[in-house]
Amino acid sequence: MKLIVGLGNPEKRHENTRHNIGFEVIDEMARLFQTGMTTGKGNFHHAKITHRGKGVIVLKPMTYMNLSGHAVVAAMNFYKIPVEEILVICDDLNIPLGSIRLRAKGSAGGQNGLKHIIQCLGREDFARLRVGIGRDHPSGSYSSFVLGKFSEEERKTADSIIPECAEAALDFVVHGIEHAMNRFNRKNA
C-alpha cells in the first residue's frame, strides 16, 4: 500500500492558492479514478484507489499546512504504511512555475508542511514531489505570496502541470521514486 499526500490548507478561502497545489493534485488523482474523498480517522480526507494492481491511499490533511505531520502520521499508523511507501506533494517557491522536482529525501527547504512532517516522523527520508509555484515573488515575507491566488496566466500554467504531477505520483506507485525522478525531473527545475 502506498500513501500519496497532497499538502494544502483547508477552508474555502484557501482554494486555488499557490500553497494548495498539493490538494489540487490529489483532487486530480481522485477525478482520474472517479472516486470521491471521505473523512478519515485522523483529521484528513482520503480516497482508496487501485493502480496497476497496487493499493493507494490519496490524502489531503485537514490540518493547516504547518501541522500536516499529524495527519500524515495518523494515516501511516492507521493503514500501517511505512515511510518508504509515502510520497508528499507540495508547493515550492524556489522552483519555476510549471516545473516539478521529485526527491527521495531531503530537508524541508523552507516548506512548513514538509518541516512539520519531518518533525513528526523524526526523519527526512521520505519521497516528495515539489511543484513549482514561481520564483518571481517579492523578497521578505513569502506568506502573502504562497497564500495568494495565481494570476489568470499563472493559473493556466498551474492547471497544465497538475496532470503531470498526478502521472508522476502514479509512476512512483508502480516503479518507485528513482524511476519517477529519472522520468519527470527536468534540468530547468
Swiss-Prot record:
Q: Where in the cell is it found?
A: Cytoplasm
Q: Where is this site: Stabilizes the basic form of H active site to accept a proton?
A: D91
Q: Where is this site: Discriminates between blocked and unblocked aminoacyl-tRNA?
A: N9
Q: Where is the active site?
A: H19
| GO biological-process terms attached to the record | protein quality control for misfolded or incompletely synthesized proteins; rescue of stalled ribosome
Give the enzyme class. Answer: hydrolase
Family membership noted in the UniProt record? Belongs to the PTH family.
Please give the name of this protein.
Peptidyl-tRNA hydrolase
Q: What species does this protein belong to?
A: Chlorobium phaeobacteroides (strain BS1)
